[in-house]
């Protein structure tokens, strides 16, 4: 028996330095008063023993939260603008163009599980945070519950992390402890795995929307857009007048996600001393059900505003080409749009400096902005850029339902044109050239004015040339010419009778030949699309 005891004590003494060495190594990686366990944690932290009164409090919390009666589809809703009147169509002259502006009522309905993060609220955003699912969350100002917390398990999705190195247990899930735990996970990867994975490509999340109203863009990108637009400064006034086209792009480069293990019961997220009455006093009820931040994406967030004063219907295609880097060398119109457009970028993260970058430039430089921060390393640290929330009652995903009506404004430019007359025939000729000019009354109805050339039906001898300048709102152009044959039975003979011609930049009408064999041509230089 004594021999057995000696063997047992010897084994304990041998193993003790090893345990101390392991403990010291973990403490050097992170030392926060044992708030975080750096050992490889289980899938979820084990529940610590509770006293009878603590178990009673936990059961009451579970019963209360699980008994909250609410429709998860109606809790988080953003209602934007309601459009009742659509402004009428209008037209106006602008230099050598006639601009037609049209308005249409549109609506957008967007379900957003990811909530964007901007610097103003990043301090409130951390994995496992307990929040109220209410209008404050919809407005991206989460109302964090100030209660004692129990432990939780975090995991990170950086590549190569084995033996549960990608997990960590936070014993007291306060904001500072959780953020320190995230830093510990990232540093663990940098020290042990970064060399094997030197170029971790960011996961790309891309979304875009042509801009028409702030309410529309909030419905598209979430209420974080309000803060972003303080820097982007989308020109809604010029867009509404049809003088500008702008697109907003959200470009996320996600380096890694930190996830929280789902609690097996609501009370597992609270400290032992927390009671149902405390939660009720903090306003937790069916109108403000509790939720938790279940996942946070860390990386680089780029918001872009692309701008042009072009009225072309190909602006969206040009913007898409500029962002993707697609060559447009074979398309003159797209090339000109890109050449004469600009961008503004608001960038969060991806820099060792903890600051927001604002960059202005031409579309030709846009790809360089997007290529930066394409991979994760120490020099391109990630910041919180988006988070998701789950209801604490049942771990169901909390989705924000955004909707808004807005006025879509489109404009089209009609460039002024010209008809060039050239008469070189051996006869007397008379022309009759007419067209309609289109305008709009205050209700948006078309007003058609018929116009005639001042030299209509006047005899012209060869060689006669003239140019007729037509405004951009000219339509239904008719060109007629006749020549005098000298024949008693056919004194006038038609040379050309072309009707309902479209407006073009240069239309060349030529007549020539003899009285008996007149000829003509109708050709176009630089047609207007």
UniProtKB/Swiss-Prot annotation:
The chain crosses the membrane at residues 214-227, 234-243, 312-321, 329-341. Residues 35-54 are annotated as: Disordered. Keywords: Cytolysis, Hemolysis, Host cell membrane, Host membrane, Lipid-binding, Membrane, Secreted, Signal, Toxin, Transmembrane, Transmembrane beta strand, Virulence. GO terms for molecular function: cholesterol binding; toxin activity. Residues 1-24 form the signal peptide. A motif (Cholesterol binding) lies at residues 515-516. A motif (Conserved undecapeptide) lies at residues 483-493. It is found in: Secreted; Host membrane; Host cell membrane. Its main location: secreted. One of its GO terms (cellular component) is membrane. Activity of listeriolysin O is regulated on multiple levels. It should be high in the phagosome, thereby allowing escape of the bacteria from the phagosomal compartment. Then, once inside the host cytosol, the activity must be controlled to prevent lysis of the host plasma membrane and loss of the intracellular environment. PROSITE patterns: THIOL_CYTOLYSINS. GO terms for biological process: killing of cells of another organism. SUPFAM superfamilies: Perfringolysin. It is a multi-pass membrane protein. The keyword Membrane applies. Pfam families: Thiol_cytolys_C, Thiol_cytolysin. Belongs to the cholesterol-dependent cytolysin family. Homooligomeric pore complex of 35 to 50 subunits; when inserted in the host membrane. A cholesterol-dependent toxin that causes cytolysis by forming pores in cholesterol containing host membranes. After binding to target membranes, the protein undergoes a major conformation change, leading to its insertion in the host membrane and formation of an oligomeric pore complex. Cholesterol is required for binding to host membranes, membrane insertion and pore formation; cholesterol binding is mediated by a Thr-Leu pair in the C-terminus. Acts as a major virulence factor required for the escape of bacteria from phagosomal vacuoles and entry into the host cytosol. This is Listeriolysin O.
